[in-house]
Amino acid sequence: MKGNFRKRDSSTNSRKGGNSDSNYTNGGVPNQNNSSMFYENPEITRNFDDRQDYLLANSIGSDVTVTVTSGVKYTGLLVSCNLESTNGIDVVLRFPRVADSGVSDSVDDLAKTLGETLLIHGEDVAELELKNIDLSLDEKWENSKAQETTPARTNIEKERVNGESNEVTKFRTDVDISGSGREIKERKLEKWTPEEGAEHFDINKGKALEDDSASWDQFAVNEKKFGVKSTFDEHLYTTKINKDDPNYSKRLQEAERIAKEIESQGTSGNIHIAEDRGIIIDDSGLDEEDLYSGVDRRGDELLAALKSNSKPNSNKGNRYVPPTLRQQPHHMDPAIISSSNSNKNENAVSTDTSTPAAAGAPEGKPPQKTSKNKKSLSSKEAQIEELKKFSEKFKVPYDIPKDMLEVLKRSSSTLKSNSSLPPKPISKTPSAKTVSPTTQISAGKSESRRSGSNISQGQSSTGHTTRSSTSLRRRNHGSFFGAKNPHTNDAKRVLFGKSFNMFIKSKEAHDEKKKGDDASENMEPFFIEKPYFTAPTWLNTIEESYKTFFPDEDTAIQEAQTRFQQRQLNSMGNAVPGMNPAMGMNMGGMMGFPMGGPSASPNPMMNGFAAGSMGMYMPFQPQPMFYHPSMPQMMPVMGSNGAEEGGGNISPHVPAGFMAAGPGAPMGAFGYPGGIPFQGMMGSGPSGMPANGSAMHSHGHSRNYHQTSHHGHHNSSTSGHK
């Protein structure tokens, strides 16, 4: 495979294969018949791409030789290649070697630069040679796949046969899985022999861990070997025994007595408890699963007796049932079990009740109790007896607090002396009152529904009277405070209203603070501190003082000085006689003096005053002004009264000599006028010139601004003088 392997594009109809310059032949001359000799449609291009990808995929892991554009050949294992690159095929070689250095003879130098992995970009690959490509990998993979699926298929068929014979369930428990009938193949055990030269431990010589009599401290070993100091404290997990306690011996004897009492109760057939207590048991017919992995689902003796009287579970399927729900009833509280059983037997017991009046009716037949009802009554009585025994044996393992004892005594005395409770029912004999048969039967039915517990004890419906039928008085609820009702106290009420009034307490605190002050009274504001503050859900400035809106004394003085300096600078800037409107800027508050002397100066380049004027001279620095032809000359309107106040030019524009100088005006060097007016210094004449000097001043307009602290006025005048 030679050439720059560029990825073919399905949108083009020409194949870009071979060398990157394959479109040019005979020394770079384009081949006119290239498109007519060989034409590739998209299907042919796709077939070539598939073949190339197949070869590259099968050559992964084999030796390849890559020739780069510089002529150097590299040999190595092909690890991966990028087929999505549009610049050719990127190649990654593992353990590269230099096979040919090409035009250069420095093979060793090239080999030193190579690492374990070499990445060659597609634009640098000129030739790729694949060696020893194994194209039979697909057949090997198919054969191995068929061998793997064959035993799996046989196992599936076996499971299907076993599933058809047994009940099909979606969820299988451990018992179902273990009893599925799979064949268990045991492996042949091989005797282990230690290798030659390896350290051999002889168990008979007492080198085992169990036979080591020396004490071993894991924390000390870790600290010695690894420098890890343990922070373990056994008292974080166990209760620390204080042996210095004077009651230590008494508590120790009590603990030993309780331990002996527990151990003397017997194991109840529990193998684990017997083993813990050191009792020898006969485990000849038990395996390890029965000894250590079995679960005793009987519970204690009370629940076992209750479960024996419950209905057997008719559902014997393979559905998984948690251990807590496998035997009904699953309630652990005996009171709940008793109430649930009484509700079930209530209707059955109510049908068996009868009255003497109903028995004496001519057409009525006295109902007889069936064996089923007798069994339910006997089971109920047995449960009641069990509950009585349980209540007698049960003891609270903790001492009752003293405050609870007072509450219990108070509740019992309240029940005895509470007059709001209805009176106890009074039992009457059947001969004390005669009722019609119809009324007697209907009353018996209603009363049997209301009080099933009294009927179950063998009393008839007319032999007793329920509480709801004898008393129609409304029961008043007991007082929340019990016998100790609170009494009103006017003094406490006044004290409560005074102590919790924030206005009164704030005034008292303010008066106490001013008691020791003998100075004269001043108008000090009276502040009341807010007792609490609840932050709102929106931004607020409630807690900010009004003083934050005014600056302090230092800041106010500094701001006043800054404003005063600013006013001085503004007044100096407004008094400037010259401004260049073409530049749009003020000339600043310069206090200048006229530069330039008579036009007949001996040195035209030094157009300055002689020693008689200012005692100094300044050289003339010409500053020509140029205007673009497409841009109008920015000439100010002289003496414009319609301009805004302060918005016009302060002094007339000083144009160049060829624009502003009139005929016969004195000219300086480079065609500029000899005198340029500046603002006069302090003590100058009214025209802005020095009092004892002479200079040329051009005609123009000027504006004078006078500002005071209270008012200002604007004067505009036109004057000309020499």
Curated annotation (Swiss-Prot):
Composition skew (Basic and acidic residues), residue ranges: 1-10
Cross-link (Glycyl lysine isopeptide (Lys-Gly) (interchain with G-Cter in ubiquitin)): 344
Keywords, ordered alphabetically: Cytoplasm, Isopeptide bond, Mitochondrion, Nucleus, Phosphoprotein, Ubl conjugation
Renumbered residue ranges of the record's region Disordered: 1-38, 305-380, 412-488, 683-722
Subcellular location: Cytoplasm; Nucleus; Mitochondrion
Ranges where the Sm domain occurs: 51-107
Gene Ontology, cellular component aspect: cytoplasm; cytoplasmic stress granule; cytosol; mitochondrion; nucleus; ribosome
Residue spans of biased composition, Low complexity class: 307-316, 338-347, 356-370, 412-421, 456-471
Coiled-coil region: none
GO molecular function terms noted in the UniProt entry: mRNA binding; protein-containing complex binding
GO terms, biological process: cellular response to glucose starvation; maintenance of rDNA; negative regulation of TORC1 signaling; positive regulation of translation; regulation of mating type switching; regulation of mitophagy; regulation of translation; stress granule assembly
PANTHER family hit by this protein: ATAXIN 2-RELATED, ATAXIN-2 HOMOLOG
Protein name as catalogued: PAB1-binding protein 1
Organism: Saccharomyces cerevisiae (strain ATCC 204508 / S288c) (Baker's yeast)
Lineage: Eukaryota, Fungi, Dikarya, Ascomycota, Saccharomycotina
Name of the gene encoding the protein in the UniProt record: PBP1
